[in-house]
Amino acid sequence: MADSSEGPRAGPGEVAELPGDESGTPGGEAFPLSSLANLFEGEDGSLSPSPADASRPAGPGDGRPNLRMKFQGAFRKGVPNPIDLLESTLYESSVVPGPKKAPMDSLFDYGTYRHHSSDNKRWRKKIIEKQPQSPKAPAPQPPPILKVFNRPILFDIVSRGSTADLDGLLPFLLTHKKRLTDEEFREPSTGKTCLPKALLNLSNGRNDTIPVLLDIAERTGNMREFINSPFRDIYYRGQTALHIAIERRCKHYVELLVAQGADVHAQARGRFFQPKDEGGYFYFGELPLSLAACTNQPHIVNYLTENPHKKADMRRQDSRGNTVLHALVAIADNTRENTKFVTKMYDLLLLKCARLFPDSNLEAVLNNDGLSPLMMAAKTGKIGIFQHIIRREVTDEDTRHLSRKFKDWAYGPVYSSLYDLSSLDTCGEEASVLEILVYNSKIENRHEMLAVEPINELLRDKWRKFGAVSFYINVVSYLCAMVIFTLTAYYQPLEGTPPYPYRTTVDYLRLAGEVITLFTGVLFFFTNIKDLFMKKCPGVNSLFIDGSFQLLYFIYSVLVIVSAALYLAGIEAYLAVMVFALVLGWMNALYFTRGLKLTGTYSIMIQKILFKDLFRFLLVYLLFMIGYASALVSLLNPCANMKVCNEDQTNCTVPTYPSCRDSETFSTFLLDLFKLTIGMGDLEMLSSTKYPVVFIILLVTYIILTFVLLLNMLIALMGETVGQVSKESKHIWKLQWATTILDIERSFPVFLRKAFRSGEMVTVGKSSDGTPDRRWCFRVDEVNWSHWNQNLGIINEDPGKNETYQYYGFSHTVGRLRRDRWSSVVPRVVELNKNSNPDEVVVPLDSMGNPRCDGHQQGYPRKWRTDDAPL
């Protein structure tokens, strides 16, 4: 009896059927040609054997019908060689083709590796049917199915969020000793792994494959590398999965990543994350904490700074040296909604840093450009955050040292505030906010920022202390110098060669005038060299519009020095240079018109018309003149090389323009065209033209284009410029006035600057270490009718009292208060409210600290008051 464990045996001359081989291919023998005898019998659909055939043992001819049916189908389908079909069945691929294009951004075809176990099942079925009497042995376990994963497959799975398709990923990685951070699983263009891909494809804020991927990375031993794997392309370089989770506003994934070891100080430095003026799209400060702050996510900010795993350092700076406060200033855009969230986030971070790092002042950190957040707000024109910083008032005693505004005393709606002048007015020791606002012409709204308190009152105080007196002294001095220069030029000797001898009293007076003129020229030269080339932001616009007088003074000084050098060298051409300097010197006297409001805007109109309207007009007009002069001169008859004599042959002349065309006709004709433009020309040359009609047509079109069109366009443009300047005359004059004050202050030596410094040294409270907090502050008397009964954080309870008072156990001296301050406050209040609309309500910025517990939040109505109501 045959052993049941053996397969079917082949008889003599028969070919045994191999297990798992349905085609009946003989093993060890050549393929018989007689097997092709009945090739064309049957159809493709007749491959299924009958139940009787299936139950009988395999015989010697069982493989032939199968071959016959396969070859028959091959001929019907057009296969040229049936043997190729036979070989294709022997080596059939086990990879099932996938879809033509993978989802998302992949362009690769992919498939899944599968094992065909049906052959073994058929072989076992034949054995069981052949020997039914043997006991049924337990079926062997099939080999495990090993899936094949590559980048397109993996990215498709995580994009769909299908955790079931990731079942075979871990065995595949362990079997082939691979990791999810290998290059074959990264996007070639960006270096992106499957974790950022999953975070970018969330459904309702979730993607169930993310925890599975993290678990697989932990089992393969590269969890931190997998989480912190950054983008490597130039566009998104440095971005990690933590950045994406924060940007997607998924706090649960932020917590998961940080708990697993995500780098909370990773820096995204790609081109996409640069400022817009540098070709980027969204600059947020590179760091994850800055991204959470700039996208208004305080809950994530709190977690990053207070989590038990790895806290984000709020003092960390990016590649530009910017902290998270700098980043908030950078994204501010002066809109209401943006300013509201930026200021709240700014206060949150500032207070949190003060509690976590008491010895550090986050607001004092400078970036690579040497700018603090306050200076950066001033330089970029972010008036919302700028006003909030300089007027910040903290009521909490633990963080009161962060205040920049302190209420000294209050009486009804009137209160006196002390503003911290640190960084605002530095007396030349370092760059100040005031200088940035005045000299940086790139700030379009700087006149609005100069109106913010205490900047406005600070400029007034400087003008009262030294600005007005110094300005009028400069006016008188400059006018005297120009009169001396004029007299010196007028009384130049008419005979001889320079340098002229000095013999008489008049000669010695002329010598004194020349020395004074040369001294003023040298003084202006070095002064303007310092002003033009040592300013923080000169720029082209600053030089030719805002700094036009500095440039003109510099040119004037150069002309004076050159004229003096030519005079000493004995060259008579010094006189031509001197007269240009004389004209320019008198024109520069317009600089002093900015000291008066009546004439201040007039000089601004002249500057804008010269550098804007007139420049464009002259450019177009010059092109017209050259074109028409070339055409009209070509129509003139050339001059003959013969003399025209009268009858007596004694007075002979050579014909020249306008009777004909000679070598100097073009330059002379340009002057004639200019005369025609202003209505002073004549047509003497018309008689010497070849085609008078063409000549007249050209002249008429020239007059229409220049005299009628261009001149009227110039007048219209100048009128528009004057109208624009008139609308903003107050702001423009105030800006010029502020520039004049700072120019005068910068001309003083350091000791004079400190002597005329505005403000007073005041002890405003305690520092973070408990020592007295002494600051240089500037006092501003203000009035507020909307929140005037909430001044709970005042320093002095007696309004206008000039004495030493006690505050929390130690003395504080306000110092240098005017005794008549209270008497000066009431007229100031009346002035501020004289022209105001009764319906207008001034809403101040929210103070930092606990909400007020005061129930009386409104003042007296302005249309009535009680008998005991304060004035």
From Swiss-Prot:
The chain crosses the membrane at residues 470-490, 508-534, 548-568, 573-593, 609-636, 694-722. Changing residue 231 to C: Decreased ATP-binding. A 1,2-diacyl-sn-glycero-3-phospho-(1D-myo-inositol-4,5-bisphosphate) binds at residues 249-251, 296-299, 344. ATP binds at residues 192, 197, 201, 236-239, 248. One of its GO terms (biological process) is negative regulation of brown fat cell differentiation. Residues 1-469, 535-547, 594-608, 723-871 are cytoplasmic. It is found in: Cell membrane; Apical cell membrane; Cell junction, Adherens junction; Cell projection, Cilium. Residues 491-507, 569-572, 637-665, 686-693 are extracellular. Residues 1-68, 849-871 are annotated as: Disordered. Changing residue 333 to G: In SMDK; decreased protein stability; no effect on ATP-binding. Changing residue 616 to Q: In BCYM3; results in a gain of function and a constitutive activation of the channel. The keyword Repeat applies. Gene3D superfamilies: 1.10.287.70, Ankyrin repeat-containing domain. ANK repeats lie at residues 237-266, 284-313, 369-398. Residues 666-685 dip into the membrane without crossing it. The modification Phosphoserine is found at residue 824. Its main location: membrane. Non-selective calcium permeant cation channel involved in osmotic sensitivity and mechanosensitivity. Activation by exposure to hypotonicity within the physiological range exhibits an outward rectification. Also activated by heat, low pH, citrate and phorbol esters. Increase of intracellular Ca(2+) potentiates currents. Channel activity seems to be regulated by a calmodulin-dependent mechanism with a negative feedback mechanism. Promotes cell-cell junction formation in skin keratinocytes and plays an important role in the formation and/or maintenance of functional intercellular barriers. Belongs to the transient receptor (TC 1.A.4) family. TrpV subfamily. TRPV4 sub-subfamily. This is Transient receptor potential cation channel subfamily V member 4. It comes from Homo sapiens. The gene is TRPV4.
